[in-house]
UniProtKB/Swiss-Prot annotation:
Residue ranges of every copy of the RNase III domain listed in the record: 18-147
UniProt binding sites for Mg(2+): 60, 133, 136
Major location (coarse): cytoplasm
Lineage: Bacteria, Bacillati, Bacillota, Bacilli, Bacillales
SMART domains hit by this protein: DSRM, RIBOc
Positions of the catalytic residues: 64, 136
Subunit record text: Homodimer.
Gene Ontology BP term (one): tRNA processing
UniProt keyword rRNA-binding, yes or no: yes
Record's catalysed reaction(s): Endonucleolytic cleavage to 5'-phosphomonoester
Name used for this protein in its record: Ribonuclease 3
The gene coding this protein: rnc
Organism this protein belongs to: Geobacillus sp. (strain WCH70)
Length: 246
């Protein structure tokens, strides 16, 4: 049985970790109970019935909806030439369990989860479904505490940069989008070329260039020719989008 002083020490450590997280993301909760609830698993509540704990399941429900909306809004604005089907496919890749687990692990969310002893013993702290749920619950808690702007600020640190870096390019067909745009506006002919191949056979890197009527539009790097061309097309789309705004 834990002594009161031991419990106090554990609580102090936990509070310090929550403060550390808030400092790391630059967002401080007004209602810290919401923050703690986001990390409270139902197994912990079941084992601490004497204390008024609430689990994170309702927050997860809310966070799931908020995440879908914010990611949808970001994609809608960032990729004006992407079809509804392509946007849906990309959003699904971003908010799927494996992606959410990566985002949660990047912030060491697993260390903060309040778990029941049984769940702890069976490795619940590293269970993908649990980590994905906690990430969604955190979004829900942040939305309730500070609103949509704070959620967008948080996603601007965790998810949106990954989209910009091309982490989900495997589900995005930038070449088709670029081809469609060029054909629609009748602005010329696209041509792809491999500028460079470097690295050993097992870890090659390709540099691709896409040109429009002989003029360079974008350069991309990838582990395969196809990936390099996709990244080059992505850069070209961004360039054409910027020109279109001028």
């Amino acid at each position: 049985m834990s002594k009161p002083k031991d419990k106090e020490r554990i609580n102090e450590k936990r509070r310090a970790k929550f403060k550390e997280l808030q400092k790391k993301i630059g967002i401080f909760f007004t209602n810290e109970k919401l923050l703690i609830q986001a990390f409270t698993h139902s197994s912990y509540v079941n084992e601490h019935r004497r204390r008024p704990h609430e689990d994170n399941e309702r927050l997860e429900f809310l966070g799931d909806a908020v995440l879908e909306l914010t990611v949808s809004q970001y994609l809608f604005k960032k990729f004006p030439h992407m079809s509804e089907g392509e946007l849906t496919k990309l959003r699904a890749a971003i908010v799927c369990e494996p992606s959410l687990v990566k985002f949660a692990n990047a912030l060491s969310f697993g260390e903060l989860v309040l778990l029941g002893k049984g769940e702890e013993l069976t490795g619940g702290r590293t269970r993908p479904a649990l980590l994905a749920d906690v990430f969604e619950a955190f979004i829900g808690a942040l939305y309730l505490d500070q609103g949509m702007d704070a959620v967008m600020q948080f996603l601007g640190q965790t998810i949106f940069p990954k989209i910009d870096e091309g982490a989900f390019s495997h589900v995005m067909d930038f070449k088709s989008q670029l081809q469609e745009l060029v054909q629609r506006d009748g602005i010329g002919v696209l041509e792809y070329s491999i500028l460079e191949e470097k690295g050993p056979a097992h870890n090659k890197e390709f540099v691709s260039r896409v040109s429009l009527n002989g003029q360079e539009l974008g350069i991309g790097v990838g582990k395969s020719k196809k990936e390099a061309e996709q990244h080059a097309a992505q850069m070209a789309l961004q360039k054409l989008k910027t020109i279109g705004k001028e």
